[in-house]
Swiss-Prot record:
Electron transport is among the record's keywords: no
Gene field: U70
Keyword Hydrolase among UniProt keywords: yes
EC top class named in words: hydrolase
Native organism: Human herpesvirus 7 (strain JI)
Chief localisation class: host cell
Disulfide bonds: none
Molecular function terms, GO-annotated: DNA binding; endonuclease activity; exonuclease activity
Annotated EC: 3.1.-.-
Name used for this protein in its record: Alkaline nuclease
Length: 480
């Protein structure tokens, strides 16, 4: 019998709607008395997740979700279901046992949740876990507005989003083959919940450098690279398009700039030195080659961002993007299209720190760094150079021509039957400012604590762990 993932998602959503995390706090943890310590939300996150899963599995007996998480709770939160404990005190008791558990046990519980949510958008539990969680798609709006009011998860699935999902695998393969050029373990990660706060969640598109232990749990070592993949649907064109043809005939930055400028809203925004960029595009440049000559409409910068953007731009404008141009060779006998690198060069394009994608990137790097710190043998002596880094990858494809639609597109020995033809990859490194990231995290944790207090009258601590993050991000003095 086929598993009905849509129905599972619907059933999970109904459970969460019945019992939000706020109602859970009021109803299940109202007897919590731990005056010796603060009530920490990361333990509440684990309690609440356990509660939701137990309730779901009891009500819908034909499906058992996250068995490994439940089993690990039973095995490692020692005898937390005590027959002498009143039912009304059950989850308060679980909370206390979690708080007294070893850091390794707590870390593993968050890692098991990551494993249980792999597949991301195809996994019902991934969708459920993102509720009552500050994800990369929400962080910008929350930080700018200083409020959760009206903040909703983006669930629009238009052509651009669907094309992006469809092409994630081939974009990752292109990165592996033509940019990283190293052995690559390719597993889709689930939701990485910040183990320190339990508030933030990051879903990584692609990565390099993460390993997996014998239990298939992630191990975050030195120099992990995070790739945020963006499919630029607005540039999906026919091969005979004038600007596509020119780029393929003469793959240079001049041809690339003409191609970029051929769209009414160019994907790389030109800004003069010292001028504030708009928030429209996530890549900007100081190179006049990308100047469209059109006057940009002025857009006020949020007051709480102006100072930081003037600091973040100089940090990032030193970066250059790597441009890789692709074409294919057609074999009529084998009915194949073999993708190859036609040209590679760098361009003066860098991340726009005013854009929401910059905020997505810093959250992903922060959460991954928390796992790195907790996995490190000696976290007090972490080298800044070994922290996770982030790249944003802009992928542009062209449409298949009629005589290409039934061909097998090949990258190395892997076939792609439905994907369009790769044309451009722009790989842009992002410079993270730990001070700014720490302030964003701390501010949002405070907003989160205030929201819980308003909803429940409970004083909950959302531990940000920014001290450890700042310490890890600071350059260590050289020994004489």
């Amino acid at each position: 019998m086929a598993i009905d993932y849509a129905q599972i998602s619907c059933n999970l959503a109904s459970i969460i709607e019945e019992d939000s995390v706020f109602l859970f706090l009021i109803d299940k943890l109202n007897n919590l008395d731990i005056s010796r310590r603060k009530i920490s939300f990361n333990f509440i996150r684990l309690c609440y997740t356990y509660y939701i899963l137990i309730k779901f599995n009891s009500r819908f007996k034909d499906t058992f979700l996250a068995r490994s998480f439940i089993d690990y709770m039973h095995q490692n939160i020692s005898d937390f279901i005590d027959e002498n404990v009143e039912l009304s005190d059950l989850y308060s008791n679980i909370y206390v046992r979690l708080q007294d558990a070893s850091p390794k046990v707590v870390k593993n519980l968050f890692k098991i949740l990551e494993r249980e949510t792999r597949g991301q958008s195809t996994n019902p539990l991934w969708h459920a876990m993102r509720k009552n969680c500050i994800t990369a798609t929400k962080i910008y709006d929350i930080y700018i507005s200083k409020s959760f009011s009206g903040i909703q998860e983006h669930s629009y699935l238009g052509d651009a989003v669907l094309y992006g999902i469809k092409h994630e695998r081939i974009i990752e393969h292109l990165l592996k083959t033509f940019f990283v050029k190293k052995p690559w373990i390719s597993k889709t990660l689930g939701l990485l919940l910040d183990p320190s706060s339990g508030v933030f969640g990051a879903s990584i598109d692609s990565y390099y450098g993460i390993s997996f232990n014998d239990n298939n749990l992630i191990e975050v070592g030195d120099k992990v690279v995070i790739f945020e993949l963006k499919f630029r649907y607005k540039y999906l064109r026919e091969k005979n398009d004038l600007f596509v043809s020119e780029l393929l005939q003469n793959p240079s930055e001049i041809a690339l700039a003409k191609f970029i400028l051929s769209h009414p809203i160019p994907a790389i925004e030109y800004r003069e030195n010292g001028k504030m960029p708009s928030a429209r595009e996530y890549l900007i440049t100081n190179n006049p080659l990308y100047d469209s000559g059109k006057k940009r409409r002025a857009c006020l910068t949020p007051k709480n961002l102006t100072f930081d953007i003037t600091r973040l731009i100089p940090m990032n404008e030193k970066n250059v993007s790597t441009a890789i141009i692709f074409d294919v060779v057609k074999d009529c006998i084998l009915n194949t299209l073999v993708a190859y690198q036609k040209a590679i060069f760098t361009i003066d394009a860098f991340i726009n720190p005013r854009h929401r994608y910059y905020f997505q990137s810093i959250l992903q790097q922060y959460v991954m760094t928390q796992f790195y710190i907790q996995d490190h043998d000696n976290p007090e002596n972490i080298e800044k150079e070994n922290l996770p880094s982030v790249y944003i990858v802009s992928a542009i494809f062209r449409k298949r021509e009629d005589d290409e639609k039934n061909c097998r597109l090949l990258i190395e020995d892997t076939e792609y039957l439905e994907e369009e033809i790769p044309l451009i990859l722009l790989i842009t490194p992002i410079t993270i400012d730990a001070e700014f990231t720490s302030r964003v995290i701390k501010d949002i944790c405070c907003i989160w604590e205030n929201k819980i207090a308003q909803q429940t009258n409970l004083k909950i601590w959302a531990q940000s762990a920014v001290r450890q993050y700042m310490a890890a991000s600071s350059a260590r003095p050289k020994t004489p």
